[in-house]
Amino acid sequence: MSVWAFFAFFSLFLSLSVRGSAEQCGRQAGDALCPGGLCCSFYGWCGTTVDYCGDGCQSQCDGGDGCDGGGGGGGDGDDGYLSDIIPKSTFDALLKFRNDPRCHAVGFYTYDAFISAAKEF
């Protein structure tokens, strides 16, 4: 029984002492700037929406009304060179079981969502 108590205590100690901090910018990340001119949110995350560039924005802001450039890459459905790098056929081959009915995330991983997310970097 004491082995289990030790294991439980040790696990609790590790979980409390090893905190996963993944902030990307600002005071939370040693005053690092976001790549591509993205805004750094109050909480230390990079992005282009008002959540990142609005009140509390730490760096690369334009006064809280949006961002001053960088990031995302346009709308209009034009994915530019990304579709040349990773065409839909490659995406389908990499994630060929993503629409398996046994999976909980059926339909979640789409090519368009992937391209949209990739354009943010």
Swiss-Prot record:
InterPro entries per UniProt: Chitin-bd_1, Chitin-binding_1_CS, Endochitinase-like_sf, Glyco_hydro_19_cat, Lysozyme-like_dom_sf
A Pfam family reported for this protein in Swiss-Prot or TrEMBL: Chitin_bind_1
Signal peptide: 1-22
UniProt protein name: Acidic endochitinase WIN6.2C
UniProt xrefs under PROSITE patterns: CHIT_BIND_I_1 (PS00026), CHIT_BIND_I_2 (PS50941)
Name of the top EC class for this enzyme: hydrolase
Keyword Magnesium: no
Reactions catalysed according to its record: Random endo-hydrolysis of N-acetyl-beta-D-glucosaminide (1->4)-beta-linkages in chitin and chitodextrins
MF GO annotations: chitin binding; endochitinase activity
SMART domains hit by this protein: ChtBD1
Homology family: Belongs to the glycosyl hydrolase 19 family. Chitinase class I subfamily.
Induction, as annotated: By wounding.
Residue intervals of the Chitin-binding type-1 domain: 23-63
Entry's Gene Ontology BP terms: cell wall macromolecule catabolic process; chitin catabolic process; defense response to other organism; polysaccharide catabolic process
Gene3D superfamilies in UniProt: 1.10.530.10, Endochitinase-like
Keywords, comma-separated and alphabetical: Carbohydrate metabolism, Chitin degradation, Chitin-binding, Disulfide bond, Glycosidase, Hydrolase, Plant defense, Polysaccharide degradation, Signal
Reported function: Defense against chitin-containing fungal pathogens.
Residue ranges, annotated region (Catalytic): 78-121
The keyword Transport appears for this protein: no
EC number: 3.2.1.14
Disulfide bonds: C25-C40, C34-C46, C39-C53, C57-C61
